[in-house]
Every structure is written in structure tokens, then in C-alpha cells.
């Protein structure tokens, strides 16, 4: 991730965060699912199932040469501890709800129901995030709340928030979830799905 001056005579980086350079690599930032929150922090999922929050500017708005990592949570490991089981899907995407809870989903672009992979959806509480950002230690065993859908169900690039909670689209259903000291399923609407479609010539479908 980098901040670049596109108006300069020569495009230069004003600040950056590079896992390969700063931490020896081993993971990538999922930049397509990253965003800037109301604190002006970059919130990003990673390829090794962590959620990071990065401070990219100082109090005057000047870019920091090296972004400061102010939060780092292994969300898959935290979810596995809460569930007491192994998750076979990786962290896909994240979103804040209107109460400041950070929702997360596991999944991918091709989740096949018949393969029975176990995934999860849930949230890190607003209180835990505030504690960590203030320099404290949060009890993630009690501040990470998880719902495990049926094996073979996982998110496929669909997560958003609204005043009522978090809307999550999986390969089998659409959910409205609400944070209530746990994951409250307000509603679940299923639809027919058999995984990726065959996209060979003449199949009349794309993808696969």
C-alpha cells in the first residue's frame, strides 16, 4: 500500500507499507477489500487471515514515510478458538457496521457446496478495537463473535453494512446479521446454487 503524488513532475511515493520490506514477506495486503475508516486509518484484510489497521498520516495529514501498524488481529485463529474447530476457508472481506463493530467473512470466488468446507462469519467488537487502538489488550476469546454456517457455505464477494446490521451474501443464501453480544441472524433468504457453472463453449454461461 502506498500514497503517491500524481501531480508531481515525476510520480513518487510519499509513504508506504510493504510486508515484504518491513516484515520479511509471507503475506499480501488484500488491497481490493481495504478501505479508510473514520479515523483516517487504513483497514485491510491480509492473505494470511489477519486484519490490520494502518496509520498512514500524522495529525496534520502529512503522509508517514512508513505507515504505522496500530492493530493486527489473526482473525481466523480467533474465530477457530471461539468455535473450537478448524476453518477450511480463508478470510475474504471485512466491513464496519454503524456501531463500529468490524464484520468479517471467510470464503472466495468459487465455494462449492458439495466440498463441505467449513467457513465462518462474525465480528470483532467495537470495544475490542477501541481497547487495542488505545494501547491495551483485548480479550478476543470474548470480543470476537462467530457464526458457523453449514459446511460448504461461504461468502462470495458479498458483504455490506446498513443501519440494521451487516448484509452478507454467501453461495447459498443472503443474510442480515446484527451484533447483539453474539451474531444475531435477523433473516436468512436461501437461493439455489450448485457452485461455479460450466463455461465451456455452448454452455450459455460465463465464469466457472
What residues fall within each predicted segment?
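Secretory-pathway ectodomains
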Residues: 1-208
Amino acid at each position: 500500500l502506498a500514497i503517491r503524488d500524481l501531480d508531481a513532475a515525476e510520480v513518487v511515493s510519499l509513504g508506504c507499507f510493504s510486508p515484504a520490506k518491513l516484515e520479511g514477506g509471507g503475506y499480501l495486503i488484500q488491497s481490493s477489500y481495504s478501505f479508510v475508516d473514520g479515523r483516517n486509518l487504513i483497514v485491510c484484510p491480509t492473505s494470511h487471515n489477519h486484519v490490520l489497521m494502518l496509520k498512514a498520516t500524522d495529525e496534520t495529514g502529512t503522509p508517514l514515510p512508513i505507515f504505522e501498524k496500530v492493530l493486527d488481529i489473526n482473525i481466523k485463529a480467533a474465530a477457530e478458538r471461539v468455535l473450537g474447530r478448524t476453518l477450511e476457508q480463508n478470510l475474504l472481506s471485512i466491513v464496519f457496521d454503524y456501531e463500529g463493530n468490524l464484520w468479517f467473512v471467510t470464503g472466495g470466488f468459487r465455494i462449492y457446496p458439495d466440498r463441505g468446507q467449513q467457513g465462518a462469519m462474525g465480528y470483532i467488537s467495537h470495544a475490542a478495537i477501541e481497547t487495542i487502538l488505545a494501547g491495551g489488550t483485548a480479550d478476543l476469546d470474548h470480543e470476537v463473535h462467530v457464526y458457523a454456517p453449514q459446511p460448504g457455505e461461504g461468502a462470495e464477494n458479498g458483504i455490506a453494512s446498513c443501519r440494521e446490521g451487516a448484509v452478507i451474501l454467501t453461495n447459498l443464501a443472503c443474510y442480515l446479521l446484527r451484533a447483539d453480544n453474539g451474531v444475531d441472524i435477523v433473516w436468512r433468504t436461501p437461493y439455489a446454487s450448485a457452485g461455479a457453472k460450466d463455461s465451456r463453449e455452448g454452455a450459455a454461461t460465463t465464469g466457472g
